[in-house]
């Protein structure tokens, strides 16, 4: 019996923030390119050096990220023309998502020899644990305590 995979689940059908986020960052190469941009990688050759990715696939992902408004490109060399890829405001707003994924990976996907990556807050120099908190009461958010409703 042939089993067909669904392209999405009902919660992700239609126009939803989850579906849009998965379309932007759900591909492993795209997610890696965005993550590297948060680590100040800007040039095609730098992305290619860090990722075991074919150049045509990298070029496609960068083009897609520009089209989606996550990156913009800026020339840094004229002959031949070469570009740096910078996060837009929309792209920078993905940082909490990537920070959460990094922390989850440190906790659940490590080698058992401690966190593979420690985060430091530059202005104060202390270790950092990113948290998602309610902007009204300051409590840390727990999924079972969050409900959804259609925006009015």
Specify the residue positions occupied by each region the protein language model found:
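Short aromatic/hydrophobic contact patches that present stacked aromatics
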Residues: 50, 84-86, 118-120
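Short histidine
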Residues: 3, 12, 30, 34, ...
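Canonical helix-turn-helix DNA-binding module
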Residues: 44, 48-76, 80
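Basic, amphipathic "hinge/linker" alpha-helix immediately C-terminal to the N-terminal HTH DNA-binding motif
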Residues: 26, 77-98
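Alpha-helical linker/hinge and terminal dimerization helices associated
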Residues: 31, 68, 97-108
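N-terminal leader segment of winged-helix/HTH proteins
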Residues: 1-25
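N-terminal helix-turn-helix DNA-binding core of bacterial DNA-binding proteins
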Residues: 16-57, 129
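C-terminal regulatory/oligomerization modules of transcriptional regulators
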Residues: 1-2, 106-152
């Amino acid at each position: 019996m042939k089993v067909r995979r669904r392209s999405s689940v009902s919660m992700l059908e239609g126009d939803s923030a989850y579906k849009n986020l998965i379309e932007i960052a759900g591909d492993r190469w795209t997610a890696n390119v965005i993550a590297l941009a948060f680590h100040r990688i800007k040039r095609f050759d730098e992305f290619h050096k860090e990722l075991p990715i074919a150049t045509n696939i990298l070029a496609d992902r960068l083009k897609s990220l520009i089209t989606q408004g996550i990156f913009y490109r800026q020339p840094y060399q004229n002959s031949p023309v070469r570009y740096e890829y910078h996060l837009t405001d929309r792209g920078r707003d993905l940082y909490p998502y990537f920070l959460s994924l990094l922390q989850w990976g440190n906790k659940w996907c490590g080698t058992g020899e401690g966190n593979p990556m420690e985060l430091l807050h530059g202005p104060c120099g202390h270790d950092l644990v990113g948290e998602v908190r309610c902007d009204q009461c300051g409590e840390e958010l727990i999924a079972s305590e969050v409900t959804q409703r259609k925006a009015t």
